[in-house]
Amino acid sequence: MIALIQRVSRASVTVADEVTGEIGPGLLVLLGVEKDDDEQKANRLCERVLGYRIFSDAEGKMNLNVQQAGGSVLVVSQFTLAADTERGMRPSFSKGAAPDRAEALYEYFVARCRQQEMHTQTGRFAADMQVSLVNDGPVTFWLQV
């Protein structure tokens, strides 16, 4: 399971001209689900995303996680993160989970974030989405479990 996390000043996701999720300061989480992923990996990735210390403390050091910084999380499914790009000029998506399994794990990940009392907004699984963000830093990390 893969999360591309970006520290943002604000972010939103729109589907068919309808805003489905919007946050102020926090994390935009682009989530990719791979074939061998399961709930245990989703739990671990959620723990890492919410605990990753990429927000500045009083001294300006990256020492706070999103909850400590008072931020929110916007989770957007992105199957292209599971692409195999090692060869050729066209990505292969053979490493990605089947859509029904990917959706179940995406929803599970979102539920785990909410169970941690994290203000969590979402996109819409498998929809054609428009994602807008103001990257803060920029600060972007690739987390994989």
Swiss-Prot record:
The listed locations are: Cytoplasm
Q: What class of enzyme is it?
A: hydrolase
Tagged with keyword Hydrolase? yes
Cellular component aspect of the GO annotation: cytoplasm
Q: Which Pfam families match?
A: Tyr_Deacylase (PF02580)
Concerning InterPro entries, the annotation shows: Daa-tRNA_deacyls_DTD (IPR003732), DTD-like_sf (IPR023509)
Q: What is its EC number?
A: 3.1.1.96
Functionally, this protein is described as follows: An aminoacyl-tRNA editing enzyme that deacylates mischarged D-aminoacyl-tRNAs. Also deacylates mischarged glycyl-tRNA(Ala), protecting cells against glycine mischarging by AlaRS. Acts via tRNA-based rather than protein-based catalysis; rejects L-amino acids rather than detecting D-amino acids in the active site. By recycling D-aminoacyl-tRNA to D-amino acids and free tRNA molecules, this enzyme counteracts the toxicity associated with the formation of D-aminoacyl-tRNA entities in vivo and helps enforce protein L-homochirality.
Q: Which GO terms describe its molecular function?
A: D-tyrosyl-tRNA(Tyr) deacylase activity; Gly-tRNA(Ala) deacylase activity; Ser(Gly)-tRNA(Ala) hydrolase activity; tRNA binding
HAMAP family, alphabetically? Deacylase_Dtd
Q: Where is this motif: Gly-cisPro motif, important for rejection of L-amino acids?
A: 137-138
Species the sequence originates in: Klebsiella pneumoniae subsp. pneumoniae (strain ATCC 700721 / MGH 78578)
What CDD domains does the record point to? Dtyr_deacylase (cd00563)
Instruction: Kindly provide the name given to this protein in its UniProt entry.
Output: D-aminoacyl-tRNA deacylase
List GO BP terms, alphabetically.
Answer: D-amino acid catabolic process
